[in-house]
């Protein structure tokens, strides 16, 4: 006999909306978080084939914020932006960092949570998700010996690329005018927080002109100029900006014009975010 998947009105006249909410509460966030993690890793690994640059898979770490429903629980848990005037944003917000493939725009991993938590702390949580034989492009705000050396020294061929800050200071070790090694001092504050950090660390500096005609200096762990040509490294940096379309799609197309997560509690907000991230990769 065929399996009847439709319940008749006599048996079940309808499913109350409260039953759906209760089911979500029972499910929690963990099953969706695990499903996203398993699928994201498998899909990214499969789609990276044939799309590497000189044997390196390419990624970018980028941050964004999402609004949540304005409930007391969400506001207490996630917090909200506070303006210079002292006013607080109308909606609670969560902060999110994603590890995105530059080749496919698929999400490899994501971390998110309280709005007031510093992006650097979220970035540390993403380091383990970055695979070996890879190049990860960062925003200049992540220029930190603790983060970048952690990435570089754990695993095989885990490289980074990041623009220098305007106030970055270093000792130039080579005479080449636009492609040279530099030695930078690790701040006393960083070494106090992490005594394992060295007093100095080295990087390769490459001077480029951006697509907007601005002069920039890129810092990278790709030290061998013959194995990693400067012009090709600059191209990897330019590709990083293409993932901005990922966030636009996630916010405007998947969340709708309201751009606001609908769930009313922190647990269901997290569940909803994992569901949205999973759906984006589909």
Regions found by a protein language model. Give the residues of each.
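Noncatalytic, basic helical substrate-engagement surface that gates or grips nucleic-acid strands
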Residues: 16, 60-61
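Short secondary-structure boundary/capping segments within folded domains
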Residues: 10-12, 50, 88
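A short, well-structured juxtamembrane/interface segment
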Residues: 41-48
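Major-groove recognition helix of helix-turn-helix-like DNA-binding domains
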Residues: 10-27
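Single, function-defining residue in the core of a domain
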Residues: 1, 24-27, 34-37, 54-55, ...
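DNA-recognition alpha helix
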Residues: 1-12
């Amino acid at each position: 006999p065929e399996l009847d998947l439709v319940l008749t009105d006599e048996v079940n006249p309808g499913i109350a909306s409260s039953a759906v909410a209760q089911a979500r509460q029972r499910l929690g966030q963990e099953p969706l978080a695990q499903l996203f993690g398993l699928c994201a890793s498998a899909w990214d690994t499969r789609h990276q084939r044939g799309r590497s640059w000189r044997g390196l898979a390419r990624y970018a770490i980028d941050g964004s914020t999402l609004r949540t429903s304005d409930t007391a629980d969400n506001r207490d848990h996630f917090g909200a932006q506070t303006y210079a005037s002292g006013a607080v944003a109308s909606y609670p917000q969560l902060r999110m960092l994603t590890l995105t493939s530059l080749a496919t725009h698929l999400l490899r991993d994501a971390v998110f949570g309280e709005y007031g938590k510093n992006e650097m702390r979220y970035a540390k949580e993403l380091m383990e998700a970055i695979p070996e034989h890879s190049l990860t492009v960062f925003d200049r705000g992540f220029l930190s010996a603790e983060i970048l050396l952690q990435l570089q020294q754990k695993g095989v061929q885990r490289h980074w690329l990041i623009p220098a800050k305007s106030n970055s200071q270093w000792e130039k070790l080579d005479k080449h005018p636009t492609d040279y090694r530099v030695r930078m001092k690790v701040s006393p504050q960083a070494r106090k927080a992490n005594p394992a950090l060295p007093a100095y660390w080295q990087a390769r500096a490459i001077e480029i002109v951006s697509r907007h005609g601005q002069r920039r200096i890129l810092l990278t762990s790709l030290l061998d100029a013959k194995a990693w040509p400067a012009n090709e490294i600059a191209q990897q940096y330019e590709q990083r900006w293409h993932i901005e379309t990922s966030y636009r799609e996630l916010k405007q197309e998947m969340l709708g014009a309201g751009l606001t997560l609908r769930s009313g509690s922190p647990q269901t907000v997290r569940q909803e975010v994992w569901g949205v991230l999973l759906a984006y990769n589909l």
